[in-house]
């Protein structure tokens, strides 16, 4: 029997994060973003050295989802202080990335990662969880709506020579629903 384990990342997880991040980014944006731009973006943004830097940053929180037995990486999430073009305050935290390999969509991994994010933010005393999502990523947007997020702004996300419109979403951690303990 296989089981998905979600655990805090360690400094040894940079390669695992890099692999699952690049794979999920390509799975999601192939056919939307130019192939050369995808590869260049992943080469920089999802390089092991980029994740080593994030893992060394005390302001970042990373969790890895692995398949047991074997501990193959199948998803992860990254959180930290907000860096979004909306008004934020000390009670806010940003869920910068929440990625799962497509094979693991629909098996409860997304809600488990989201609950981990909510619990992490609440434990840190945060009252609102923010994230940005590509406006045309219908599956992700439906998931976030189901989780209780609402749109509070927009931003442009630059990949290669193109800009893509993201929606900035927020979840009130003091309200009802999943954000509630």
What do these predicted regions represent?
Residues 4, 8-14, 18-33, 37-103, ...:
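Acetyl-CoA-dependent GNAT
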């Amino acid at each position: 029997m296989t089981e998905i384990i979600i655990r805090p990342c360690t400094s040894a997880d940079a390669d695992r994060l890099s692999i699952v991040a690049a794979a999920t980014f390509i799975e999601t944006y192939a056919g939307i973003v130019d192939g050369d731009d995808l590869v260049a973006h992943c080469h920089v943004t999802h390089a092991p050295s980029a994740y080593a830097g994030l893992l060394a940053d005390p302001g970042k929180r990373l969790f890895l989802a692995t398949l047991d037995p074997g501990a193959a990486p199948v998803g992860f999430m990254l959180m930290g202080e907000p860096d979004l073009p909306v008004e934020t305050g000390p009670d806010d935290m940003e869920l910068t990335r929440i990625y799962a390999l497509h094979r693991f969509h629909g098996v409860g991994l997304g809600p488990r990662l989201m609950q981990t994010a909510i619990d992490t933010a609440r434990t840190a005393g945060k009252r609102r969880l923010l994230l940005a999502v590509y406006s045309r990523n219908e599956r992700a947007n439906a998931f976030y709506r189901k989780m209780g997020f609402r749109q509070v702004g927009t931003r442009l996300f630059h990949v290669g020579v193109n800009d893509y419109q993201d929606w900035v979403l927020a979840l009130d951690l003091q309200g009802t629903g999943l954000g509630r303990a």
